[in-house]
């Protein structure tokens, strides 16, 4: 009887873990499903050389129309001001994905706010365009693989 109970508990735990894994996978961002966060021209691409051996880990856009939009739906997990990066907005999308928006003049959102894909979240300044980075499980990934084709 004890062995049968242990087997049932183990099977139940396995089922729960499988459900969690399936739910997490369902939240993963699919290739070419994200909206472009800026209408600006891409000035620097992911992986291109920035200086010396340093490479860009995201995309740098020209100022465009100065509007910054959420690439995907999610929750704002951070809004902070940094000396060299302006107002930084970070959105968590689930499935291990976050998007980072830098060089903003301001944010229209605060930590904890839910945002929809394409929703206006801030404005860039007139001198620097938007810097956009996408990360999966803490590692920078090429946004071009996840953004819709223009």
Show the residue positions of the predicted features.
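Extended non-globular C-terminal regions
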Residues: 99-102, 110
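Extracytoplasmic/periplasmic cell wall- or extracellular glycan-interacting regions that localize
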Residues: 1-86, 90-92, 100, 116, ...
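Acidic, glycine-anchored pre-beta loop/turn
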Residues: 107-119, 138
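Active-site loop architecture of trypsin-fold serine endopeptidases
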Residues: 124-132
């Amino acid at each position: 009887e004890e062995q049968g109970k242990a087997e049932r508990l183990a099977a139940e735990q396995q089922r729960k873990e499988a459900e969690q894994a399936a739910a997490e996978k369902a939240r993963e961002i699919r290739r070419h499903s994200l909206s472009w966060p800026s209408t600006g021209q891409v000035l620097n691409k992911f992986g291109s050389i920035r200086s010396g051996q340093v490479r860009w880990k995201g995309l740098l856009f020209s100022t465009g129309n100065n509007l910054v939009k959420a690439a995907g739906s999610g929750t704002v997990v951070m809004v902070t001001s940094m000396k060299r990066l302006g107002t930084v907005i970070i959105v968590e999308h689930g499935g291990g994905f976050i998007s980072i928006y830098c060089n903003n003049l301001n944010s229209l959102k605060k930590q904890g706010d839910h945002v929809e894909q394409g929703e206006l979240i801030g404005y860039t300044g007139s001198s620097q365009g938007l810097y956009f980075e996408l990360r999966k499980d803490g590692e920078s990934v090429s946004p071009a693989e996840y953004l819709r084709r223009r």
